[in-house]
From Swiss-Prot:
Residues 28-38 have a biased composition (Basic and acidic residues). The gene is E1. Residues 464-614 form the SF3 helicase domain. InterPro entries: Helicase_SF3_DNA-vir (IPR014015), P-loop_NTPase (IPR027417), PPV_DNA_helicase_E1_C (IPR001177), PPV_DNA_helicase_E1_N (IPR014000), PPV_E1_DBD (IPR046832), PPV_E1_DBD_sf (IPR046935), Rep_E1_papillomaV (IPR016393), Znf_lg_T-Ag_D1_dom_sf (IPR037102). It is found in: Host nucleus. One of its GO terms (cellular component) is host cell nucleus. Phosphorylated. Sumoylated. The lineage of its organism: Viruses, Monodnaviria, Shotokuvirae, Cossaviricota, Papovaviricetes. PROSITE patterns: SF3_HELICASE_1. Residues 28-60, 160-197, 637-662 are annotated as: Disordered. Residues 199-365 are annotated as: DNA-binding region. There is a cross-link at K571 (Glycyl lysine isopeptide (Lys-Gly) (interchain with G-Cter in SUMO)). Gene3D superfamilies: 3.40.1310.10, P-loop containing nucleotide triphosphate hydrolases, Zinc finger, large T-antigen D1 domain. A motif (Nuclear export signal) lies at residues 110-119. This is Replication protein E1.
Amino acid sequence: MDDTSGTEGDECSELERAGGWFMVEAIVDRRTGDKPSSDEDEDEDADEGEDFVDFIDDRPVGDGQEVAQELLLQQAAADDDVAVQAVKRKFAPSPYFSPVCMQPSIENELSPRLDAIKLGRQSGTAKRRLFQLPDSGYGQTQVDTESGPLQVQDICETGTQDGRQDADEGSGRNVGGNGGQEEERAGGDGEESQTQGVQTDKAACGVLAILRASNQKATLLGKFKEQFGLGFNELIRHFKSSKTVCLDWVVCVFGVYCTLAEGIKTLIQPQCDYAHIQVLSCQWGMTVLMLVRYKRAKNRETVAKGLSTLLNVPESHMLIEPPKLRSGPAALYWYKTAMSNCSDVYGETPEWIVRQTMVGHALEEAQFSLSEMVQYAYDHDITDESMLAFEYALLADTDANAAAFLSSNCQAKYVKDACTMCRHYKRGEQARMNMSEWIWFRGDKVQGDGDWKPIVQFLRYHDVEFIPFLCAFKTFLQGIPKKSCLVFYGPADTGKSYFCMSLLRFLGGVVISYANSNSHFWLQPLADAKIGLLDDATSQCWCYIDTYLRNALDGNQVCIDRKHRALLQLKCPPLLITTNINPLEDDRWKYLRSRVQLFTFKNKFPLTTQGEPLYTLNDQNWKCFFRRLWARLSLTDPDDEEENGNPSEPFRCVPGQNARTL
């Protein structure tokens, strides 16, 4: 420590001597290579502390280091421009000036007016491609991890929790849902493999991430076909809405843990009546294919949430659709794989698989018979095409003819023909009955017995004498000329329409409206009815009746025009009319006075405290009314059906079948 070589002398300050000493020590160490003594090491270790750590760059300006730093920044910016330009060239036309080099683009340089003579100007913005490349399923597919360094994903990761992102489709990792969290699928000691990072462009990573998200379903469909040997769409039918419910669902889940893939075979059983499960391994993990029949109908969202909880897999890694119920190849696939050792089956096989695969069910299939459909429509009194199509389709699971109807390509024609034939049969059946037989026939269709007293009490409430009403009603039903029209007159809200509509509903009549009087066919419904109703006749309507419908009120033969048919001559059925105008008091309609029988409803319609009608007029009460006053109304006595049974068999439009001997 006595060596003072290299110092400036005694006249130097202590600080300058210290600086000189350290300089000498550094020179000696570099020249001779001698290591400092142990006490010097101890002093240096002791001097290392917070007081000697310098965080401020107090170097003099112009020492030359900022030049290298500026050069590095320029080189990095140039590399970034090259990477961004490489990505943009895939999705947008080249601009006139390139950001990489300030030279004009070659196409503009060769022909400056080339852009002006184009028929359609190309947009400068990036466009979404209709068909993506097949190797861009997850954005970065088929990246060889052994041939070169991986890209550093940290700078382009936006939603990860650990700062990592899966860059290889076959690396044994599974990318999570929206957050992008990855989980190690590969075996080993749990340590992450060391990769050499290189600088990556943020814009390129963002575009690749978007491509991966938009092509995710296509990638899953491709992986399914690669593993199972057939397309996923061959087994399913598509539901556009995720809210549509169904009992049967086909689910394919990718990237499942091995333990959970085996455990789902037991976990799914309490929720379903049938489960067909196949488990295969792939580079993403385990792939689980399931055909599940739940105990209750579920929609796609409910199924996805339930399986996501059981399998710990995001919903974006699932393909969920209902199965094809009428596809023979699809049913045969589930049937054959159920017998192999690669599947685990729980529960009873669905009937749509059994029906298309079992020999017995195949032999039971028959051709569609229109007469059976007509018989069904006749028995259930269905003449509306939409109602018949819906109700008959519901029988497909239990009725072979209904199943054949659904398998036919002429369903609309069959429905139309069946309704047409049913209307013909109904019209012919009605035409052969007189009024007494028709009333008895309509009464037999009513279930239960009612009370006739509310009808009488309602008439007395309006001060209508029951005996005169009964006499007029008797001649009305018999169709006696000049007595076949009943008019119910009174102010509003007195129950006129309520009374007439209840009677019309029991007798199966029709309603005609004066609003359609401009048409020549507005009286056509009267051709197919036993009784008619003209509700709320106004003064214009009475003038029309007085001018054109006197014969109809008489109950005589009239001629009715029907659409696309010849004119029909028939006896006009009895007619009920409700009105707020008294036709008997107006001299304009004096010729109608002898043709109508008028009853006045004076009082307001009575209601209970709950808002229900005080007097109930339903089919059961009208049935009891007619049965009670059958003799008073001079209706013909029906045959002794209660003692001798029905004299004729029910109508059948289906041919009889001979018993087949074994």
